[in-house]
From Swiss-Prot:
Gene3D superfamilies: 1.10.10.410, GatB domain, N-terminal subdomain. One of its GO terms (biological process) is translation. It comes from Synechococcus sp. (strain JA-3-3Ab) (Cyanobacteria bacterium Yellowstone A-Prime). The lineage of its organism: Bacteria, Bacillati, Cyanobacteriota, Cyanophyceae, Synechococcales. This is Aspartyl/glutamyl-tRNA(Asn/Gln) amidotransferase subunit B. Heterotrimer of A, B and C subunits. Coiled coil: none annotated.
Length: 490
């Protein structure tokens, strides 16, 4: 009697993200201290953010504006009434021993973001809530990158009181790729709107991952584990992939999954246990008594909605539908607001959209990457790039000549046409000028000419090269090919 081996169970990840974004206000959420990154430790502090007795918080109006704009950009419902709460916990970088946040009545709820995946699929990720809170300070550990193993720790309170929004997703994410793309799309949207600079390395955008595993198709959630300390999009993806495999192995071995917070170690490419995961009851939330409720009017919403720019997802669709660009090109050009604005200015100046895209994604992108520059930093104006593209289309210069003069235009600016004329680079499109040069090329290469006429037609490229050399690259390629073909076959 034989018994069939049980089918191997397939598992899926259930992932939700909590993304903390520092708002790009010049002053803190409840006080007037500056928020600039990189200032000397404890030079951007005041009695309010230090929690000194007798101080009272006052909400920075810009924080409310930016939070509502973020909610609108993320397709959320804006609450007409919300409030602040105290989140109670003790940690050395939290001077008041509580954090002012929002608990049961956040500023925005029920939003969504659509992401594009590498296989061409799109997926909508739900947003549960978006709430406002203050950031904590920062611990600097001597001799280690975390508390464990350090000889002592210092506290920098510059970050305490910096305004944050926390964006909590629905558990709609299934893979590390989806998670990384979701965070990138959030970053694009917030940067476009001028609400957050999205710098993961500086901590202005931080992501915590909540992940559990379950058999594929099961409606039941597994035990959730939180992962922290990921400072790049790749790290988010790798941490999720590692943790998924770790949890699956534990489940298959019959080991329990502990609800805990784990730390992603970049050097060892693994997660390690950090602490037991707290529940919301551990924080003993209660309404903040020193701040009034927040009220957002329909007029405020309408005004802030009107001030939002066209967002990247809308640009991508428009570039494909109006300009006929590919999905890849549309995504590249809309990824950063500076890039998109430059591209649109080039097209507005009369350039063919596909030609403009090709130049920006190849030669100009290479120059920017090499010199670590962005479009506002270069001397090449959009109108000049459009002029350069026009010179190629008119047959005034070849693409080769355009590539040769591009670095000078990028560094010094000026008129493309004037530079071409000053350097004598105008394309030779007159057959009466090219014919004598072709005759010279053939006369100078009798051996190759004989081989060509005996059937070695691959030498045609050699003759094209010799003609281009003689004309210093100025011969009209199409005309040169036609004339050479006629002379060689004649």
């Amino acid at each position: 009697m034989t018994v069939a081996a049980p089918a191997k169970v397939e598992y899926e990840a259930v992932i939700g993200l909590e993304v903390h974004c520092q708002l790009s206000t010049r002053s803190k959420i409840f006080s007037s201290s500056a928020t600039a990154f990189g200032a000397p430790p404890n030079t951007q502090i005041d009695p309010v953010c230090m929690g000194l007795p007798g101080t009272l918080p006052v909400l920075n109006e810009k924080v409310l504006e930016y939070a509502v704009k973020a909610g609108l950009a993320l397709n959320c419902t804006i609450a007409p009434y919300s409030k602040f709460d105290r989140k109670q916990y003790f940690y050395p970088d939290l001077p008041k021993n509580y954090q002012i946040s929002q608990y049961d009545l956040p500023i925005a709820t029920h939003g969504w973001v659509e992401i594009q995946l590498s296989d061409g699929r799109s997926k909508r990720i739900g947003i549960t809530r978006l709430h406002i809170e203050e950031d904590a300070g920062k611990l600097v550990h001597a001799g280690s990158d975390r508390l464990s193993g350090s000889s002592y720790s210092l506290v920098d309170f510059n970050r305490a009181g910096v305004p944050l929004i926390e964006i909590v997703s629905e558990p709609d994410i299934r893979t590390g790729e989806e998670a990384a793309e979701y965070v990138q799309e959030l970053r694009r949207i917030l940067r476009y709107a001028g609400l957050c600079d999205g710098n993961l390395q500086e901590g202005s955008l931080r992501c915590d991952v909540n992940i559990s595993v379950r058999p594929l198709g099961s409606p039941t959630f597994g035990t959730k584990v939180e992962i922290k300390n990921m400072n790049s999009f790749n790290a988010i993806q790798r941490a999720i992939e590692y943790e998924f495999n770790r949890q699956v192995k534990a489940v298959e071995a019959g080991e329990p999954i502990v609800q805990e917070t784990r730390l992603w170690e970049e050097n060892s490419q693994r997660t390690i246990s950090m602490r037991k995961k707290e529940g919301s009851s551990d924080y003993r939330y209660f309404p903040e008594p020193d701040l009034p409720p927040i009220r957002v009017t329909e007029a405020q919403k309408a005004r802030w909605q009107a001030e939002l720019p066209e967002l990247p997802s809308v640009k991508r669709r428009r570039y494909q539908q109006v300009y006929g660009l590919s999905v890849y090109d549309s995504r590249y050009l809309s990824d950063e607001r500076n890039t998109a604005e430059y591209f649109e200015a080039v097209v507005a100046a009369g350039a063919d959209p596909k030609a403009a895209a090709n130049w920006m994604m190849s030669d100009i992108a290479s120059y920017l990457n090499t010199h670590k520059l962005d479009y506002p930093d270069i001397a090449l104006k959009p109108e000049t790039l459009a002029e350069l593209i026009g010179l190629i289309e008119q047959g005034t210069i070849s693409s080769k000549i355009a590539k040769e003069i591009l670095p000078e235009l990028l560094e010094k600016g000026g008129s493309a046409r004037a530079l071409v004329e000053a350097k004598g680079l105008t394309q030779i499109s007159d057959s009466s000028l090219l014919e004598p040069m072709i005759a010279e090329v053939l006369a100078e290469n009798p051996e190759q000419l004989q081989q060509y006429r005996e059937g070695k037609t691959k030498l045609f490229g050699y003759f094209v090269g010799q003609l281009m050399k003689k004309t210093q690259g100025r011969a009209d390629p199409k005309l040169a090919n036609e004339l050479l073909k006629r002379h060689l076959d004649g």
